[in-house]
């Protein structure tokens, strides 16, 4: 069966069992039984409780839960309580950040306009839009939202803004004509789509689809079927948790074997190994990552980027491809006059001379032959026409004043058959008809031309020159209008027969121009190793022209259309995408396929957009970025991040923030693991030497709550470096636990463990196990506090300004040092913390052992840096 747009209006009415006077009540009832209500199906909502429990799915969190259970069974209630508190805080933070993540379908429902004007059995009635059924005849005029999909059956110069659905920046001229060939959504000019707006004219349409069967409904279906992907950080932390578990199990097995070999009871050896394994897991890691990302969201909100899904903060830092919508994202979403062509010369809009009679005449005529208004910044009318009156405003010529001076006395409205509009005015004591329209059509009706020497007969050479200029404008992606005029006898009623013997005045070329900052932002992306790609519903020539201006496209061969994608298999598209920078005339399904093709090539994809048509791809992308000012609610709700200034450059800043945050999270992980490894080594050395265990359970509890958490969080807010934008994006499958990273953790943990063991032996030989345990506890706590400064950078920082540039780390150090000093020196606390009270000399010894780890590790960093530079040479 033919598509609806391929059938005549009469055939469509017959197909939906309707007539021009509308449906009867009985027909409405039958149609509703068959097609349902005109509303979007609502997906099953997750409760806050479900979202809360989903936070416990991470592998590392599951290990922590198991650790808490085992600790409780072994009688270590303090450790079990700490673990439970930490993972509960993490779950609460995660729930707060994600509780609004599933609102896309609610926003889509808002697009089903609240009311509609309908013919029911020949009578015009106003109804809630949800009551529309297939076969209803709807009445439309300028300003109306279209309540359902339909086929036009009556047209009076109807123009519709479909930009939110198709990406087309210009209002679409609607036509009654039947379209014989297959056509993409944006080219179905005899169809009307739910959620679009009428900008001009009047019309009637018969409803052909309602609810989930409309084009907006299909997008709702795509949103439901599009799965959300893990961000690189989520994948990395899962991988990290699994690898860490394996390492800890191996270590526990070795320790258990050693203990049994030394003659200890199997049960005692097992409990000791498990208790140590629980201590080895960085319980605070998940919470610290969540807190650091939350701080990142606050910083980015100040820089015009609101994060709706927490993991997107880091995910942006690993983006390798940005698929950007054109209209309203890279461009201003506002038609603007770019050039004039008059008397054989091209003049830019910035260089118009209003003192020149011809240029002023063209400016005035473009305001007079125009139905749009701009009052107090509120634009009403066709975007092309508002661009013309806005140009006048730039030069201090207000439309109201010109129209009052030369009042309109007649008009012939625009229609798609004539491709022109005419208005009649009293100018210089003459009746003058101004005609604007398509260049080709008006040249056919022109027999004279205005020049600086006066009006003369137009020649073929003149027409060829005008056509060449028109083609030049078109190749630059500009929309061109021709302006002509002629004198009309007084008291004459205008007819279309008057539209001939015209005087050619000039051309006006306009476009939706790029944002001023787009070019610099694209260049910054390319420098950072990120591939910018334009995906739009607009025409190929227009899209390519914009892309070339801002540096996305270099040759027209890098541009293609949705029809090209339609004929490709997924495998073919996957091989095709690296060669294409601009995709034009694409559907929502095409956008998802393009994003998925890049993802299958191992890329981390960000998709930006503002329209309804962008929502499914925003959700499919690794990071969806919506425009906050011009964006639809649908796009915002489907996205992970919303830009409050609609500025493409904000994305670049977000990428920089994301890369720095990932680096800071690595510093925090390095700090936690190297400190834990140092503690494990101290316990292992003591065990192998037949000495008492250096730490009491309360010591590990104190370390977990204080010397772990505060410095790790402070490292997470380490001041950012712009140098990260000189690097290529990291690989999507790059693990946090690289060999180099594990090597650094092992080496730094060895130093901390060594100094802790020296402290333990010093105290043990002075006055037995309790003093040794006190020395070990104090040395480990303080060494970890000093170690926070080691983890600020991969390079030595001890003699640089960077050593002191993190006030939060300094605060964490001072607070931690004061608390551990109080615990070690105040007599009343020794029983609670299972320590001996230290005198000043003993405390100084503990501080000295702890501080020694700082210069040793800084020296190791310096040696490693020199060796790396030598290898590079």
Model segments located where?
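Membrane-water interface at loop-to-transmembrane-helix junctions
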Residues: 731-750, 770-775
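Generic alpha-helical transmembrane segments
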Residues: 707, 752, 774-788
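Alpha-helix capping/termination and helix-coil
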Residues: 370, 602, 655, 659, ...
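Helix-coil boundary and interhelical linker segments in multi-pass alpha-helical membrane proteins
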Residues: 687-696, 760-772
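Conserved cytosolic headpiece of P-type ATPases
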Residues: 1-726, 736-737, 750, 777, ...
């Amino acid at each position: 069966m033919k598509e609806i747009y391929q059938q005549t209006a009469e055939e469509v009415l017959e197909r939906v069992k309707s007539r021009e006077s509308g449906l009867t009540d009985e027909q409405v009832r039958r149609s509703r039984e068959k097609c349902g209500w005109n509303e979007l199906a609502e997906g099953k909502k997750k409760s806050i409780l479900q979202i809360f429990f989903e936070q416990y799915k991470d592998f590392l969190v599951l290990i922590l839960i198991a650790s808490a259970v085992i600790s409780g069974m072994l009688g270590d209630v303090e450790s079990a309580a700490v673990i439970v508190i930490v993972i509960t805080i993490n779950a609460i933070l995660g729930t707060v950040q994600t509780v609004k993540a599933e609102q896309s379908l609610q926003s889509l429902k808002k697009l089903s306009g609240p009311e509609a004007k309908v013919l029911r059995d020949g009578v015009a009635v106003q109804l809630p839009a949800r009551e529309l059924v297939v076969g209803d005849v709807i009445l439309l005029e300028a300003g109306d939202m279209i309540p359902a999909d339909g086929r036009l059956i009556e047209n009076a110069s109807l123009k519709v803004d479909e930009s939110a659905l198709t990406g087309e920046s210009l209002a679409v001229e609607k036509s009654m004509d039947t379209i014989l060939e297959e056509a993409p959504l944006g080219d179905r000019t005899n169809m009307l789509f739910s959620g679009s707006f009428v900008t001009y004219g009047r019309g009637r349409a018969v409803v052909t689809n309602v609810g989930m069967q409309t084009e907006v409904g299909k997008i709702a279906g795509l949103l439901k079927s599009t799965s959300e992907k893990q961000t690189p950080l989520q994948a990395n932390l899962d991988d990290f948790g699994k690898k860490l578990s394996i390492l800890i199990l191996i270590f526990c097995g070795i320790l258990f074997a050693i203990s049994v070999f030394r003659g200890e009871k199997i049960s005692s050896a097992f409990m000791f190994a498990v208790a140590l394994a629980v201590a080895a897991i960085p319980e605070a890691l998940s919470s610290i990552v969540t807190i650091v990302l939350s701080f990142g969201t606050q910083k980015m909100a100040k820089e015009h980027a609101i994060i709706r899904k927490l993991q997107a903060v880091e995910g942006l830092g690993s983006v390798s491809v940005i698929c950007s919508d054109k209209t309203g994202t890279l461009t201003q979403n506002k038609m603007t006059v770019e050039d004039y062509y008059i008397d054989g010369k091209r003049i830019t809009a910035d260089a118009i001379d209003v003192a020149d009679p011809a240029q002023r005449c063209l400016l005035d005529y473009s305001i007079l032959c125009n139905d749009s208004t701009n009052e107090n910044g509120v634009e009403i009318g066709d975007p092309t026409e508002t661009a013309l009156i806005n140009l006048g405003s730039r030069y201090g010529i207000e439309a109201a004043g010109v129209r009052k001076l030369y009042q309109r006395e007649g008009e012939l409205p625009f229609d798609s058959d004539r491709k022109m509009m005419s208005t009649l005015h009293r100018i210089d004591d003459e009746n003058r008809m101004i005609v604007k329209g398509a260049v080709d059509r008006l040249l056919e009706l022109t027999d004279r031309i205005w020049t600086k020497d006066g009006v003369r007969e137009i020649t073929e050479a003149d027409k060829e020159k005008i056509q060449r200029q028109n083609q030049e404008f078109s190749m630059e992606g500009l929309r061109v209008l021709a302006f002509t005029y002629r004198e009309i006898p007084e008291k004459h009623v205008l007819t279309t027969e008057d539209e001939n013997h015209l005087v050619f005045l000039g051309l006006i070329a306009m476009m939706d121009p790029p944002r001023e900052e787009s070019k610099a932002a694209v260049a910054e992306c390319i420098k950072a190793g990120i591939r910018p790609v334009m995906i739009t519903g607009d025409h190929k020539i227009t899209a390519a022209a914009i892309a070339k201006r801002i540096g996305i496209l270099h040759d027209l061969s890098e541009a293609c259309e949705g029809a090209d994608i339609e004929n490709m298999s997924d495998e073919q598209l996957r091989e095709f995408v690296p060669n294409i920078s601009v995709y034009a005339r694409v559907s929502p399904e095409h956008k998802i396929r393009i994003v998925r093709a890049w993802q299958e090539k191992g890329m981390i994809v960000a998709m930006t957009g503002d329209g309804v048509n962008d929502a499914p791809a925003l959700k499919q992308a690794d990071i969806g970025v919506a425009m906050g000012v011009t964006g639809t609610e649908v796009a915002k709700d489907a996205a992970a991040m919303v830009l409050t200034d609609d500025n493409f450059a904000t994305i670049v800043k977000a990428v920089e923030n994301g890369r720095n945050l990932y680096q800071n999270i690595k510093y925090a992980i390095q700090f936690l693991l190297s400190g834990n490894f140092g503690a494990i080594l101290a316990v292992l050395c003591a065990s192998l030497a037949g000495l008492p265990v250096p730490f009491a359970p309360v010591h590990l509890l104190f370390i977990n709550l204080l010397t772990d958490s505060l410095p790790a969080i402070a490292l997470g807010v380490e001041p950012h470096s712009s140098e990260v934008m000189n690097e290529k994006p990291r690989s999507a499958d790059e693990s946090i636990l690289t060999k180099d990273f594990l090597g650094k953790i092992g080496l730094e943990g060895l130093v901390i463990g060594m100094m802790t063991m020296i402290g333990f032996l010093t105290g043990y030989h002075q006055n037995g196990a309790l003093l040794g345990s006190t020395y070990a506890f104090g040395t480990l706590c303080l060494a970890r506090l000093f170690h926070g400064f080691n983890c600020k950078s991969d390079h030595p920082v001890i003699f640089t300004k960077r050593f002191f540039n993190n006030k939060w780390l300094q605060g964490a150090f001072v607070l931690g040092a004061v608390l551990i000093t109080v615990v070690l020196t105040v007599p009343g606390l020794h029983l609670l913390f299972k320590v001996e009270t230290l005198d000043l000399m003993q405390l100084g010894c503990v501080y000295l052992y702890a501080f020694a780890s700082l210069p040793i590790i800084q020296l190791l960093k310096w040696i490693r840096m020199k060796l790396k530079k030598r290898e590079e040479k």
